[in-house]
Amino acid sequence: MRCMFSGCSSLKYLNLSNFNTRNVECFGNMFHRCSSLTSLNLSSFDTHKVKNMGGMFKRCSSLKSLDLSNFDTKNVESMCEMFGECSSLTSLNISNFDTRKVDRVEDMFIKCHSLKTENIIVSDDRILAELNSFSRHFKKIEDECNII
């Protein structure tokens, strides 16, 4: 599914509820440059075999929120620029992300200027470190923020 919708700049909404992603290993750049995409429901995605999520949502500049709490990322090796340049993204749930096998997280949140600490849910220390590489305001929930 690499680059499947890449460059679909007029695309505003997608219904992917019937997509069978059970055997997919690469979501790299899947929605790259879908600059008009405002919402995306990926709750039916089976991601247990995925190894590459690099650039998956890169330059989705109209996307405001994403709930990826259902994503199984235990086999993912690359998340570089996954949300890069998602300049309107204000809310993100990646609470179940597991980055133990990930070797590339650089620029995961580069130019995500609208992303606020109170609207991101994360539980992984490596992702927290990447968040802090562009903003020092992110903390874990035990430090009294909504990031877990």
Locations of regions flagged by a protein language model:
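Negatively charged
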Residues: 1-148
